[in-house]
């Protein structure tokens, strides 16, 4: 039996983690590599062969697509999570999901240490490590890109390439794209390289999930999305009568039709947890469609004040997820409140998807407090128009008293 300490390395198959794998082996560790399939286009067979050739003891490849969609993406849609009004948290949600597989595999293979290739400036190091510590407080972490010894040896990509050549680590012959990319079934994110200049538009060839609206069909796509307690249940495509029911099928289908219509492209500068601002470009077609539909159903079904309190809590929850606190007491508490607010968010929303836009055009629910007769401008109904006089007088009292004391409002 080997006396070497065992490390589980979160492995991507790329240059960085392949060099980290070899470096850990040089340090005397026995290394097992872990890869999570969360829907990214990846040649897992080739990555496995590469890791074994470099010297990994074993390579674990875990299919986590269903868990990712059902336990992370769907709850995020249900809670209405958006970071800084635009980012639907595709990468942020994947990290705690991957951490589950990482920690399960660490336990199965008796690894007391994990390692990863996240850089010291990004959010992923925080998300991975906070999630892993929450799932197993005893776990130890080796983060090479935060170790002086590693950083001094590898100043940049050239040093990594030289190291790979020296140790026979296979390097892709395909020229490296001038940006980095992270993909899963929910989205693709792009950053760094030429994207670090916010004044320069991202090139069209960058996008992989969506096509330009200039090339998209001139025929709108119409779908019905049904929700139960805030969770997507089914999608019906009007033109073909096709119905999708499982979360994985629903998201895959919406990604396809949303991508064809150029839905879900976002180019932004965001605030990282470390305090840095970072430029990111995202493609999130299917989740964008679901988010628009869910927001429409929420406003239709929820009491006004519940909706406003829920919206405030969703902002807090989005911050927690972005910053790596999916597993935290505060997130557990807020999640309970947000899910509780969704008990009446059930019904059907009809959407038109066209040229980058997602428009809710009709909705139905047995849970809404919408009263057509009460709201109608054509009949008085049970709400007497005379009652508004007292309502206005009471609300005007505060304004009258304020401006009586401090002078009339400035008309400019």
From Swiss-Prot:
Instruction: Indicate which residues the UniProt annotation says bind ATP.
Output: 10-18, 36, 115-123
Protein's pathway: Amino-acid biosynthesis; L-arginine biosynthesis; L-arginine from L-ornithine and carbamoyl phosphate: step 2/3; Nitrogen metabolism; urea cycle; (N(omega)-L-arginino)succinate from L-aspartate and L-citrulline: step 1/1
Q: What class of enzyme is it?
A: ligase
Pfam hit, one: Arginosuc_synth
Question: Does the record bear Amino-acid biosynthesis in its keywords?
Answer: yes
Annotated transmembrane regions: none
Q: Which SUPFAM superfamilies match?
A: Adenine nucleotide alpha hydrolases-like, Argininosuccinate synthetase, C-terminal domain
Name the residues that bind L-citrulline: 87, 92, 123, 127, 180, 189, 270, 282
Reaction catalysed by this enzyme: L-citrulline + L-aspartate + ATP = 2-(N(omega)-L-arginino)succinate + AMP + diphosphate + H(+)
Molecular function (GO) terms for this protein are: argininosuccinate synthase activity; ATP binding
- UniProt-listed GO biological process terms: argininosuccinate metabolic process; L-arginine biosynthetic process; urea cycle
Enzyme Commission number(s) from the entry: 6.3.4.5
Query: What's the domain of life for this entry?
Result: Eukaryota
Q: Which CDD domains match?
A: ASS
Keywords linked to the UniProt accession: Amino-acid biosynthesis, Arginine biosynthesis, ATP-binding, Ligase, Nucleotide-binding, Urea cycle
Tell me which GO cellular component terms the UniProt record holds: cytoplasm
**Which HAMAP family does the record cross-reference, listed alphabetically?**
Arg_succ_synth_type1
The entry assigns this protein to a family as follows: Belongs to the argininosuccinate synthase family.
Q: How does it assemble?
A: Homotetramer.
Please give the name of this protein: Argininosuccinate synthase
- What species was this sequence derived from? Aedes aegypti (Yellowfever mosquito)
Top-down, what is the taxonomic lineage of the species of origin? Eukaryota, Metazoa, Ecdysozoa, Arthropoda, Hexapoda
